[in-house]
């Protein structure tokens, strides 16, 4: 078995979907290990645009089996809505998408509570997507949540869901406008529809290992949103790095062939939290406009700033990348000069690494190196050496600083707008 992992190296929205799509065409199985439909990316294939949230993008490859792993959380109505949208675009999904019976279920009550918890936080709000991901992982960790396997025992399902609803009702009182009977009734219809998709993931992937299948793992969110190694508390509720891959899927570390970090050529972030290289000026506005930086899941404009190599190096220290996919290089085509963050200082002292304390992170001074822009279009370039020398210098600076080869370079939105270096 040969496993390739594609992970976001920044705060998400790096453009993981394009490389995942390319690699999925070489894979027999494509997996999601963690997260839910709070993730989002777009793939352009054969002139058709597909939006993915909870579903693995390997569905674009008709020969690829797709697995939503045990570490994921699934809102069942959204799962079917996304499937239907893909099928309307001509994708045939029958027999190619499966959900682990150990994955936890996101209910409407989780989504309602998500919003109420943001209100509770007041000025300290996280900027959640409102998809119920955090509350679902919370019930998972308190061992009160429901897994996919629980949905098929009506008595267990009803008792557990009522218990969750009762707990939230005690906490939020009249603020919670939730009808538990309505959701219980809805699953009477969904149960039979869902049954063909739910499987025991462990023998499925064990069989793939015996057959020496090529497996692609598609990371959701990104390392800086990791519950342990990201900018806590402004993070998601799962392990978004390599650790989440190992625990969310029964794939041993010895099966890993390549761990690819996807790095946007500048930095973006959605929601709240410290962002040291953010540009609240014409530079940030230009990146936002030219890069069409609007979230696929939330529709929110992304905050934009210079490439932060302190972030990328921290990400590499956590995930041990074997290669980097640099994306959206073309968005920087019209800049006279480019800055890259190389270190932070706090109270006059240079910091050794990426600070855990968000209060410190919000106050750091950023040290930059300035590199010349190339002022030439890169879109459509297919050979690395056809790029302007300044563009190559930018790429090679990143390689040297992080210590990882940039193997793929995105130079446009289409699937074939990708330079591959040997």
From Swiss-Prot:
It is found in: Cytoplasm. GO terms for molecular function: adenylosuccinate synthase activity; AMP binding; GMP binding; GTP binding; magnesium ion binding. Mg(2+) binds at residues 13, 40. Its main location: cytoplasm. The active site is at 13 (proton acceptor), 41 (proton donor). IMP binds at residues 13-16, 38-41, 129, 143, 221, 236, 300. Binds 1 Mg(2+) ion per subunit. InterPro entries: Adenylosuccin_syn_GTP-bd, Adenylosuccin_syn_Lys_AS, Adenylosuccinate_synth_dom1, Adenylosuccinate_synth_dom2, Adenylosuccinate_synth_dom3, Adenylosuccinate_synthetase, P-loop_NTPase. Keywords: Cytoplasm, GTP-binding, Ligase, Magnesium, Metal-binding, Nucleotide-binding, Purine biosynthesis. GTP binds at residues 12-18, 40-42, 302, 328-330, 410-412. Substrate binds at residues 296-302. GO terms for biological process: 'de novo' AMP biosynthetic process; cellular response to cadmium ion; IMP metabolic process. It catalyses: IMP + L-aspartate + GTP = N(6)-(1,2-dicarboxyethyl)-AMP + GDP + phosphate + 2 H(+). Pfam families: Adenylsucc_synt. Its EC number is 6.3.4.4. GO terms for cellular component: cytoplasm. Pathway: Purine metabolism; AMP biosynthesis via de novo pathway; AMP from IMP: step 1/2. Its cofactor is Mg(2+). Belongs to the adenylosuccinate synthetase family. Homodimer. Plays an important role in the de novo pathway and in the salvage pathway of purine nucleotide biosynthesis. Catalyzes the first committed step in the biosynthesis of AMP from IMP. This is Adenylosuccinate synthetase. It comes from Pyrenophora tritici-repentis (strain Pt-1C-BFP). The lineage of its organism: Eukaryota, Fungi, Dikarya, Ascomycota, Pezizomycotina.
């Amino acid at each position: 078995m040969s496993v390739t992992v594609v992970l976001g190296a920044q705060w998400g929205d790096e453009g993981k979907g394009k490389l995942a799509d390319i690699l999925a065409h070489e894979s027999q199985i494509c997996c999601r290990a963690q997260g839910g439909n709070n993730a989002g990316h777009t793939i352009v294939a054969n002139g058709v645009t597909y939006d993915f949230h909870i579903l693995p993008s390997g569905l674009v490859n008709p020969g690829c089996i797709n697995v939503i792993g045990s570490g994921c959380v699934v809102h069942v109505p959204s799962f079917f809505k996304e499937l239907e949208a893909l099928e309307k675009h001509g994708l045939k999904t029958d027999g190619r998408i499966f959900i682990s019976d150990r994955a936890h279920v996101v209910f409407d009550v989780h989504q309602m509570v998500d919003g109420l918890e943001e209100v509770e936080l007041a000025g300290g709000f996280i900027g959640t997507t409102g998809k119920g991901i955090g509350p679902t992982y919370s019930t998972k960790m308190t061992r009160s949540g429901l897994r996919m396997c629980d949905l098929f025992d009506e008595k267990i399902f009803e008792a557990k869901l009522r218990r969750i609803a009762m707990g939230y009702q005690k906490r939020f009182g009249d603020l919670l406008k939730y009808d538990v009977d309505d959701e219980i009734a809805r699953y009477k219809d969904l149960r039979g529809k869902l049954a063909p998709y739910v499987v025991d993931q462990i023998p499925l992937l064990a069989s793939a290992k015996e057959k020496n299948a090529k497996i692609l793992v598609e990371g959701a969110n990104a390392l800086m949103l990791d519950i342990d190694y990201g900018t806590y508390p402004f993070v998601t509720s799962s392990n978004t790095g390599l650790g989440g891959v190992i625990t969310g899927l029964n794939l041993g570390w010895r099966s890993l062939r390549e761990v690819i970090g996807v790095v946007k050529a500048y930095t973006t972030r959605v929601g709240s939290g410290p962002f040291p290289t953010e540009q609240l000026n014409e530079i940030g506005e230009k990146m936002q406009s030219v890069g069409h930086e609007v979230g696929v899941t939330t529709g929110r404009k992304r905050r934009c700033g210079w490439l932060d190599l302190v972030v990328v190096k921290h990400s590499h220290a956590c995930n041990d990348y074997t290669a980097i996919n640099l994306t959206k290089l073309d968005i920087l085509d019209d800049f006279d000069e480019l800055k890259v963050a190389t270190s932070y200082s706090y109270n006059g002292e240079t910091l050794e690494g990426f600070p855990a304390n968000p209060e410190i992170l919000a106050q750091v001074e950023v040290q930059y190196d300035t590199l010349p822009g190339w002022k030439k279009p890169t879109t459509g370039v297919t050979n690395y050496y056809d790029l302007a020398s300044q563009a190559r210098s930018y790429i090679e600076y990143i390689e040297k600083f992080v210590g990882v080869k940039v193997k793929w370079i995105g130079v446009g939105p289409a699937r074939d707008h990708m330079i591959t270096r040997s």
